[in-house]
Amino acid sequence: MSEEETVSAPAPASTPAPAGTDVGSGGAAAGIANAGAEGGDGAEDVKKHGSKMLVGPRPPQNAIFIHKLYQILEDESLHDLIWWTPSGLSFMIKPVERFSKALATYFKHTNITSFVRQLNIYGFHKVSHDHSSNDANSGDDANTNDDSNTHDDNSGNKNSSGDENTGGGVQEKEKSNPTKIWEFKHSSGIFKKGDIEGLKHIKRRASSRNNSSINSRKNSSNQNYDIDSGARVRPSSIQDPSTSSNSFGNFVPQIPGANNSIPEYFNNSHVTYENANHAPLESNNPEMQEQNRPPNFQDETLKHLKEINFDMVKIIESMQHFISLQHSFCSQSFTFKNVSKKKSENIVKDHQKQLQAFESDMLTFKQHVMSRAHRTIDSLCAVNAAATAASVAPAPAPTSTSAYAPKSQYEMMVPPGNQYVPQKSSSTTNIPSRFNTASVPPSQLFVQYQPQSQQHVTYAKQPAHVPNFINQPIPIQQLPPQYADTFSTPQMMHNPFASKNNNKPGNTKRTNSVLMDPLTPAASVGVQGPLNYPIMNINPSVRDYNKPVPQNMAPSPIYPINEPTTRLYSQPKMRSLGSTSSLPNDRRNSPLKLTPRSSLNEDSLYPKPRNSLKSSISGTSLSSSFTLVANNPAPIRYSQQGLLRSLNKAANCAPDSVTPLDSSVLTGPPPKNMDNLPAVSSNLINSPMNVEHSSSLSQAEPAPQIELPQPSLPTTSTTKNTGEADNSKRKGSGVYSLLNQEDSSTSSADPKTEDKAAPALKKVKM
């Protein structure tokens, strides 16, 4: 098949191209026409790609945008649409319909806006001034384009006659309606005509898609804006509605892999921006900055630098002076032992005066530096304001009293101990002469921050007031006022040991016992104000230190000092085991001894009788922890605590009946063999604790006894004599009657029948 057969049939000159004509058909016709003008070499450039014709040199697959742009500029068939400027540093673009069609040869789109966006991404920017198509055609490039066009018209290729006529009609319309021509230039100037090696240095900007879209919107809004007339101008194809409708109706982009349908953005109407008078952008021009500066800017800058150097020298001298003062004082302080006290005090006073003078000098220096800094800022602002007012309004502005007039007040960070008062002075007498430069006028108003009457202001050392709640009473005035309603009345407990009418405590009967209610309010303790938090119940380590503690201002304590603090605590309550009147006077005043419970249940070791009686004393059951069998004088020891508890119970039963046990009872040998334990008699368990209840307990029926073998223990004559001597003293003792049941029972019987009726039992002497 020949190459002529692949080209579509020619259309009549009067009829436009059909709507179904693809993108490649127009390009193929132009390519064939150019090929005929060059001598018939267009057959090499025409290639068949499926059902579509692609004309022109095909760029490589891996070519990037910048190489494609250079190839488009070198393509002579597109010189009437895009071409180099005479300088070779920029290029011109005619944004018409034919240029959008030509983009399909190198790119996969026909959108001029996308092409401009890619130019912005690679560093190209649009030159501000626009060119018209008539001015552009007057140059050498226009002549070249005209010659090529006439040569194309005179070519003998008949296959492209229809497309040429169509292209000629479009060109005639473009000439009748001249459009603006855009000029683009690379920001770094690397993109030049003939410099192919410099293309590899042009890189894509690492900018986001949002920035590129914003730039494209700015370019699209500025492309049709006429700065001179202030009106928005449209290209010929957009200004004529009929032309635009026909042109877009005939043009349908054909992209490989895309549907043959008109995109939606071609159907939408173009939304124009409102007219706006844009102010000229301020460029970073050094010449303009030099013009905005005051004429004496360099002289003022040099003066400021000199003053800063003087300040540094002053700081160094001040540090040296301070170090010398400390060194001299330390050297003199070692001689205080060899010098009299008065002379040493004079040395300390001289050192303090020198420190005060040094501190005042440093404060003056600081004030001078701060005022000069404010004066410098204000002077520059005043000069700039005057220059701006002179350039805008030629009328003379009202002159101020001084160009260096500072602000009325300045914010300064002042230590909490030093209280400065701003004072205005019309002269600079407080500033040393070395700091009075010629640039400072004598009428300058400095904001002087001077201390009050005291020159040497020291921070008040307030000791942290942490009251000692253990050794020192808390005064009334020390309590904060927010607790006044809490303790409006004194809540101190009665002191049961305090004597009445300043009399010493004696053995007289009194009503204030230790068993009284400790929460009873005191009648009068001499408190003048409200008590706001408890006494002697505050732990300093747990106290909330975030609350401010007032100072100790009250001389009077909250309770009398002569009373010991330990008596404020309530005495422990004792359980009333019996009548307190039954105790003797010497035992009544002595505190009772409390013993803890025994962990061992003593009654579980021996069987109890069925008819066990409960003691009527204080409503408690009789549970002895120290049990002796009548026939066995050896004691059976369970625990010392249980023994003491039983004895304490027995001590409260009857008056004058408590006799201390012998120490040998507590250390008696325990039984080695549990099988040799004696029998526990029911009469022994049911025996009364004192003599008063013996009549009520004598009617109890005895329980059957448990017979156990009884060990024989030797007895001595000393034990018998001791028992006979103490027998008369222990007749009324409840413990004695408990341990020696037979003796107490036979005391009321006939003494003649004692040896016959009573069995041989051993007695345990206390």
Curated annotation (Swiss-Prot):
Which terms in the GO cellular component ontology are assigned? nucleus
Annotated Basic and acidic residues bias: 171-181
Cellular localization per UniProt = Nucleus
Residue ranges for the region (Disordered) are 1-52, 129-181, 203-247, 547-619, 657-766
Could you tell me which residues carry Phosphoserine?
S220, S556, S733
Query: What family does this chain come from, according to its entry?
Result: In the N-terminal section; belongs to the HSF family.
Protein's UniProt name: Flocculation suppression protein
Give the originating organism: Saccharomyces cerevisiae (strain ATCC 204508 / S288c)
Read off the lineage from the record.
Answer: Eukaryota, Fungi, Dikarya, Ascomycota, Saccharomycotina
